[in-house]
Regions:
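Phosphate-backbone binding interfaces of nucleic-acid-interacting proteins
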Residues: 531-652
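Beta-strand segments within the central parallel beta-sheet cores of soluble alpha/beta enzyme folds
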Residues: 287-290, 474-476, 576
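A glycine-rich helix N-cap at a beta->alpha junction
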Residues: 76-91
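Intrinsic disorder at enzyme termini
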Residues: 470-551
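Cys/His-rich short segments
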Residues: 115-168, 172
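Helix-rich, typically C-terminal accessory recognition domains appended to large enzymatic cores
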Residues: 120, 343-380, 391-499, 609
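N-terminal catalytic cores of NTP/NDP-binding nucleotidyl/phosphoryl-transfer enzymes
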Residues: 2-75, 94-109, 114, 131, ...
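Structured secondary-structure scaffolds
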Residues: 1-48, 100-104, 148, 154-369, ...
Length: 652
């Protein structure tokens, strides 16, 4: 029987610099899903790679004094090295500078032009170089890019445009009739309310102001817009040919089963990409999942903030599987996760060294101490054994359910319940006490057999997330690899097998102070900048004219509790909150959609200016202002009371 195919992709990494752990998280997440699908019996094809064209790269190469091709060769090689370091099992690593890809992009552009989906015109508006994105003045947030918060520059040039509106209704209908196409649900609502329903503008799909890109075949002074170039990797990488015979691989694999991408590029993958595919008369991918960000403790990772953590640095401290464990286990399904060195040490010591490592070590040590390493099922059972077996046998179905819903962190939590239950079983059965009674020797043997069998089942489920650890555990137990189907049965470990004589430490405990001292050596304060107290960032603002105490006293500040929050239709940046202030509830509109979801807002207590004259923003009445702070990268943070305060409390 032929295996069912499963085609999974990540967004291809932009080659502007070395990827940090937040970038690396995505490929590790995709790898865990791909590995699990293989365990389920699917014929998996996992594609990742690098996005290598664009103005930003041209400028970076110029700064480095090398050609753009030399620059991307270096960075792409570094990205691939890190993906390999993280033990990712991709089947293809595509580069957008690959000859086959560039050839097909030219043909795709030409086909779209021949269909009159692309036409020639002039572009005048704003352009964000880091995001390689065009915006109108009205789309900017305080004059900055609505996606990354950086300044945009005016752009005026001859360009080709794609008729996005031609396919808008068809895409809206597709999204409405395919509820799983965009996940999580909140991402779908954002795309519908902020982009599709208000109406799509035609998209600029070529540039003439720089040269580092794929030339338009019939008008070579133009280069293809980097997103049209990059998105097509999902089909060119598997052999698509728009005016010839596509490969058997393409016919087998397309449409993709899952595009796994960051939430910040969901628009490109759920609006631009589906419309491009419609233009090519190709089916749409089955699902696009916009995962949350992995943040440093003080916000989104940024080189300008100096808070970047790199995967290879983490691996040097903790090992590959410990890093995989952390990024997979700590990332929620929808909201952003946090990574810090301190949290990594805590998780390694508590979960990996104690819960898992200590369990394996104790079990092997007791097997050697009491039975010379031989593990036998003597069949002397008690009710506690059935409790253990029933619990362990219930876990694989739970893991399967979570993985099918892409709730990878929840799936890992389920796996670790097996190891925690085995530790509890040791406390319940007390093998050391059984060993003191010769008449209970067979009971002791049964207990140790149950522990070994439980660990084997847990290790099999762990394989997709921490493959090296699974291999090391099974090797020490002298156990064979199992299929997921085998996990419906408890007792497959061969009775009479012998475990290793000297158990290997899976995860050594770390001393936090020692780790932080080494981190400080790794990332010393820059010589030209004095070390800031408590690692706090500072921003110097241009001073505004002084005001009197009387003027300041006219403003009223109170604590408000957000009891409801909704997105403002036809706005890309506004949220509308219902805020309880004393016995009143006020409606306040805030430009913080890029920084907080509606779910995150509800329940928060915030600082509010309550005596501003009501005004309409995007046609919605606003009766106050919620206060935020903004850092140098444009990230906003709500100002909240340090201690618990009642709604309505005066801020003085």
């Amino acid at each position: 029987m032929e295996k069912q195919k499963y085609y999974i992709t990540t967004a291809i990494a932009y080659t502007s610099g070395k990827p940090h752990i937040g970038n690396t998280y995505e490929v590790v997440l995709a790898d865990a899903i791909a590995r699990y699908k293989r365990q389920q019996g699917y014929d998996v094809f996992f594609q990742t790679g690098t996005d290598e064209h664009g103005q930003k790269i041209e400028l970076k190469a110029e700064e480095a004094g090398i050609t753009p091709k030399e620059f991307v060769d270096n960075v792409s090689g570094e990205i691939k090295r890190i993906w390999d370091l993280m033990n990712t099992s991709y089947d293809k690593f595509i580069r957008t500078t690959d000859e086959d890809h560039e050839k097909q992009v030219k043909k795709i552009f030409k086909k779209m032009y021949a269909k009159s989906d692309i036409y020639k015109g002039h572009y005048e508006g704003m352009y964000c170089t880091p995001c390689e994105s065009f915006f109108t003045e009205s789309q900017l947030v305080d004059g900055k890019c609505p996606d990354c918060g950086r300044p945009c520059v005016p752009a005026k040039e001859e360009a080709y445009f794609f008729k996005m509106s031609k396919y808008a209704d068809k895409l809206i209908d597709y999204i409405n009739t395919h509820p799983d196409f965009i996940q999580p649900e909140s991402r779908k609502n954002e795309m519908m309310n902020n982009f599709l329903l208000p109406g799509l503008q035609d998209l600029c799909v070529s540039r003439t102001s720089f040269k580092w890109g794929i030339p338009v075949d019939f008008d070579p002074k133009h280069v293809v817009y980097v997103w049209l170039d990059a998105l097509t990797n999902y089909i060119t990488g598997i052999g698509y040919d728009c005016d010839g015979e596509s490969t058997e691989q393409f016919k087998k694999l397309w449409p993709a089963d899952l595009h796994l991408i960051g939430k910040d590029i969901i628009r490109f993958h759920t609006i631009y990409w589906p419309i491009f595919l419609m233009s090519l008369d190709l089916p749409l991918p089955k699902q696009v999942f916009g995962h949350p960000w992995l943040l440093q403790g003080d916000g989104k990772m940024s080189k300008s903030k100096g808070n970047v953590i790199y995967a290879d640095e983490l691996v040097d401290f903790f090992g590959v599987d410990a890093v995989r464990y952390f990024v997979l286990h700590e990332m929620p399904f929808e909201n952003d996760g946090v990574i810090t060195w301190e949290l990594m040490v805590e998780r390694l010591n508590s979960e990996l060294a104690n819960t898992l490592g200590n369990l394996v070590n104790r079990t092997i040590s007791m097997s050697n101490k009491y039975f010379g390493g031989v593990v036998e099922n003597k069949g002397v059972t008690e009710p506690v054994d059935d409790d253990l077996k029933n619990f362990i046998l219930s876990v694989p179905a739970k893991v399967n359910e979570k993985m099918d819903k892409l709730r990878v962190a929840d799936a890992m939590t389920e796996v670790f319940t097996i190891f925690k239950r085995c530790n509890k079983y040791i406390d319940e059965t007390m093998p050391w006490a059984l060993a003191k009674d010769e008449e209970k020797k067979d009971r002791l043997a049964t207990v140790l057999y149950n522990l070994v069998e439980g660990i084997c089942i847990g290790a099999t489920l762990l394989k997709s997330f921490m493959p090296e650890t699974t291999e090391r555990i099974l090797a020490q137990l002298n156990a064979q690899d199992r299929e997921l189907e085998d996990l419906k049965t408890f007792g497959l470990y061969p009775s009479g097998n012998k475990v290793t004589e000297k158990p290997e430490i899976l995860f050594a405990r770390l001393d936090l102070k020692e780790v932080m001292a080494k981190v400080a050596e790794l990332h010393p304060p820059k010589a030209e900048e004095p070390a800031k107290e408590e690692n706090e960032d500072v921003i110097d603002l241009e001073a505004k004219p002084e005001i009197t105490f009387e003027d300041f006293g006219k403003l009223q500040f109170q604590v408000g509790k957000i009891i409801k929050c909704e997105e403002v239709k036809k706005s890309k940046k506004l949220l509308c909150s219902q805020v309880q202030i004393g016995s009143q509830v006020r409606q306040i509109v805030s430009g913080i959609k890029a920084h907080y979801s509606t779910e995150e807002m509800v329940g928060k207590k915030v600082m509010v200016v309550t005596n501003l004259k009501p005004a309409k923003l995007a046609g919605v009445l606003s009766e106050g202002m919620i206060l935020c702070a903004e850092d140098a990268d444009g990230n906003l943070s709500l100002m909240v009371p340090e201690k618990e305060m009642p709604a309505g409390a005066e801020i003085c």
